[in-house]
Amino acid sequence: MALPFSLLMALVVLSCHSSCSLGCDLPHTHSLGNTRVLMLLGQMRRISPFSCLKDRNDFGFPQEVFDGNQFRKPQAISAVHETIQQIFHLFSTDGSSAAWDESLLDKLYTGLYQQLTELEACLSQEVGVEETPLMNEDSLLAVRRYFQRITLYLQEKKYSPCAWEIVRAEIMRSFSSSTNLPQS
């Protein structure tokens, strides 16, 4: 009984540390939140990806939007914020709730919501420091088109279990690609 309590206390301390020390120390808090979300996405796997190889698709993840040296910190944070909003929306659809374990889905929503809250707090600090356009229109459109392609794919595949597995794996890949934010 002591081990689960110790583990719970460690998680509470980590959670408090990540949300209480948000003096826009985003790379650390963002990394912790990403780890939690990625673990949940991994736990959501219901079928073997190898049984879905025929359903693979290149959704055209806009990696250039997340290249740290192209944008300053507020723009990069804004791009990640848009991505997390789109992921939240994707997993909030009716088709999604039928495809996944409800408990894991609720935990995913909570993790994504926490990420959005931290990013919004950091964005408001960053924008107060420098007046920079948050995200240029081309980058915003690239992220939205990427998620539109994913949504169309799911519709074409009639939200099949394999289609959701391909999308889950794609979201894990793209989510982990968006974790490196510029320090300055």
From Swiss-Prot:
Species the sequence originates in: Equus caballus
GO molecular function, one term: type I interferon receptor binding
BP GO terms, sorted: adaptive immune response; B cell activation involved in immune response; defense response to virus; humoral immune response; natural killer cell activation involved in immune response; response to exogenous dsRNA; T cell activation involved in immune response; type I interferon-mediated signaling pathway
Cellular localization per UniProt: Secreted
Family designation: Belongs to the alpha/beta interferon family.
Protein name, as recorded: Interferon alpha-4
Pfam families listed in its UniProt record: Interferon (PF00143)
UniProt signal peptide: 1-23
PANTHER family membership: INTERFERON ALPHA-5, TYPE I INTERFERON
InterPro entries to which the protein is assigned, alphabetical: 4_helix_cytokine-like_core (IPR009079), Interferon_alpha/beta/delta (IPR000471)
Keywords noted in UniProt: Antiviral defense, Cytokine, Disulfide bond, Secreted, Signal
Record's GO cellular component terms: extracellular space
Role description: Produced by macrophages, IFN-alpha have antiviral activities. Interferon stimulates the production of two enzymes: a protein kinase and an oligoadenylate synthetase.
Keyword field contains Phosphoprotein: no
Disulfide-linked positions: C24-C122, C52-C162
